């Protein structure tokens, strides 16, 4: 019984309200949440770790976005919203903001892993990030890029990689770059029942062959090639196609010739929807970073975080933090008894 009294007493002190004016009754719910058998506070009742969870799913999440949901949006002419995410917090906020789709883009090579370009990221890298995103995305339809080197060798290689992305990464579909030449791979994947998003125009994984990050489809010949690629990708079974860095007029015409939605990135608002890299559009990067022309910066997350961290540093240096409200109280008699016990300890020689 002595142990039970001590454990219960400890729970009360750990959960004492920061405002001493609050009645003791405000503490009682904490005791009710303790384990009855031992009276030791349950994990749900105590969270004193410095590694705090980012929170549970929303209380009333949206209905899960499915391929049928996306088809209905397309038929109604309502633009489809897509945003990249590379980890739990970025997916959590994208989902909470109501994104229809979340893309685990291979752009995470640069924005999350500090790599030079997307060609460095591996399938195993993508799987780690996919799982992180999948844990947060309760409603949005999730898709992951197949990274360079994981699908170009053969349709069978593409299928094996796609299966791993869906099975191990826990996302709903895959995206791969390329036009007519990738049709066999797309067909093999979709035949196995895995949704595929195509990607034509500027394909960053092939930027070396394209002469860098250049606008595509600016000549009649190139525009016709773009349309041919789009039709081939659609015929192979892709349920959606990303069009990147293409003049808006060309992207609009291509969109009109297709029976599946297009998602533009640097391709104007004539597409069926839009996608941006979250880090770019939220301004979560240091000053001086190059931004493509098509990016609109909607926030300045870097600056907000910088100011907060600088203030934290200053308050730690000045001992303004932690203040009393950030600490756990101890009964005065316990403190006196502890100090007395310490004073009675023999001095070390």
From Swiss-Prot:
GO terms for molecular function: 3-methyl-2-oxobutanoate hydroxymethyltransferase activity; magnesium ion binding. Pfam families: Pantoate_transf. Keywords: Pantothenate biosynthesis, Transferase. InterPro entries: Pantoate_hydroxy_MeTrfase (IPR003700), Pyrv/PenolPyrv_kinase-like_dom (IPR015813), Pyrv_kinase-like_dom_sf (IPR040442). GO terms for biological process: pantothenate biosynthetic process. Pathway: Cofactor biosynthesis; (R)-pantothenate biosynthesis; (R)-pantoate from 3-methyl-2-oxobutanoate: step 1/2. Gene3D superfamilies: Phosphoenolpyruvate-binding domains (3.20.20.60). GO terms for cellular component: mitochondrion. Its EC number is 2.1.2.11. It catalyses: 3-methyl-2-oxobutanoate + (6R)-5,10-methylene-5,6,7,8-tetrahydrofolate + H2O = 2-dehydropantoate + (6S)-5,6,7,8-tetrahydrofolate. NCBIfam families: panB (TIGR00222), PRK00311.1 (NF001452). Belongs to the PanB family. This is 3-methyl-2-oxobutanoate hydroxymethyltransferase. It comes from Emericella nidulans (strain FGSC A4 / ATCC 38163 / CBS 112.46 / NRRL 194 / M139) (Aspergillus nidulans).
